[in-house]
Structures are given as C-alpha cells and as structure tokens.
Amino acid sequence: GLITDISERTGPVELQLENTTYTKASIFMNVFNCHVNRTPTTGTVEEISYKPGKFLNASLDKASDENERNYYKIKCLKSGEEIIMVQIAGLIVRRIVCEVEQGQSLKQGDRVGMIRFGSRVDIFFKNKKVLAKIGQNVVAGESLIASE
C-alpha cells in the first residue's frame, strides 16, 4: 500500500478515544496491492468494533469517518500502550474480513484479516518514532511504520 497521511489526530469516537491524541498513519491499497492486513505489534486484541457506513473512495480523508470500517484495539505486550488499527472499506468490492477475536494474542505481523480491493488501513499510536514517510510504498508484515 501507499502511505497517504501521517498526522496528529484524536482517537476514534467509536472506541471512546476522542480525548486522546495519537499519531495516525494511513495506508491506501489500490486494486493491485495485496489486501491482507497484519498486526503492527505483538499484543492482545482488547476490542473489535464494527461500524457500518458509506463506500467512498478510500483514498479520501473523510473515508476514515464515513466509510464502513472495523476497529481493533490492541494492547502492546512490550509497552502496555494501545495501538488502534482500522480497516476501512473502499469503493469497489466493499467487504471487510476479520480473522481474529477479542482476547486473542497476536505476534507482530500476524494476519488480522483483509479488505477487498481499493481500501485503507489507519493505524493510531503514541510514543513511537515514525519511520514511514508520506508517499512511501509499504508491504504488510515487512515494512516498519514506527518503532519504540
């Protein structure tokens, strides 16, 4: 996918995190990219929350708030901090697949699910050094977005 945004933003309202500031990295996947999504950290899935919505072009910023999406709150094993991963459905096929359950332990790079074609993943994190840059192509399970 392609890093389309790295910015400071409040957390998702759907997880009652609107009063917490995070760094958000957005990764847009076009129809030619692999759409398998992998966990950005080793930790435990604390919460999964589905939100129905529209099917706008996932490269648009407003897709984060308006499109169908699935939220994962993952408690990082190493730091104890929460990392939020959001699968955002896109314009074309419009299907989010979740392959994990609440309470499940994950290792960094484990498969979480997939989004079918023309979609996006947003990752919210705190207290990390951002390694990725806007415009950079990244590969799930291989490219580092941020580090301790």
Question: Language-model segments: which ranges?
Answer:
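Contiguous, well-folded functional domains in the mature portion of proteins
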Residues: L2-E148
